[in-house]
Amino acid sequence: MATWKFIIRSVLFFLDLAMLLAALALIAVGFWMGYDSSFDTDLKNVIYKYDDPKSLADAKFNIRVWLIVVFWSIIGLSLGAVVTAVLGMISSVWPKRKGFMITYLVLIIVLVSLEIGCGVAVLVRRNSLHDNTNSLIDAMYTTNSVNDLKIIQDKYNCCGIENSLFNVMYCGPMSQKPHCDVAVFDSVDNTMMISGIILLVILILQTIAIILPVPILISRKKTYKYSYEPRVTQLADITEDTRF
């Protein structure tokens, strides 16, 4: 194997190894955050409380739908990354089977396309998330959900709603605390921004992983043909000369 091919395959192997470890870690953290009762217990008790008045129940339902869609999108993409990374590692250590590398290249292109699509969808639906968050906090104050409000206000160190009559009751005239609808959405938005930066780094690494196999796939082994015809012709000429 040529030295440059060995270097490319080595880099590709470690890129896929990093992608595999990151995907497995993301799956583990996702399930831990989603299903471990010890993680953010108070907030889960707020979102997954089902005996609320209709307006508050509808607002919580919309947030739950968001959480479920985002959660399973992350898990699904992570599982796809695991399969793709394993196939990439196999193709990098098995140079004689280009079929593995072609399959890997197709899968990682599909994976990157899905990741970009999910990122664009989240950006497009960002205003919807903002509206759902505002509706949730507004419904808590409107229905006077005392337990939910206490959890939210203690968690985010906030009070009231932006441009609302409830602010005098809950915040007081001299309060410097941010409004709860703003504080909650800012927290969610910051998390989305951090996730977007991480996704951008992953996409850059995956783009490199897409480019690396291309020189190997388009390269061809050089074949050498040895012709003995001149030697045969020379022997024939010598034979004719000896006849005379």
Swiss-Prot record:
It comes from the Eukaryota. One of its GO terms (biological process) is innate immune response. Keywords: Membrane, Transmembrane, Transmembrane helix. One of its GO terms (cellular component) is plasma membrane. It is a multi-pass membrane protein. InterPro entries: Tetraspanin/Peripherin. PANTHER family: TETRASPANIN, TETRASPANIN-1. This is Tetraspanin-1. It comes from Caenorhabditis elegans. The lineage of its organism: Eukaryota, Metazoa, Ecdysozoa, Nematoda, Chromadorea. The gene is tsp-1.
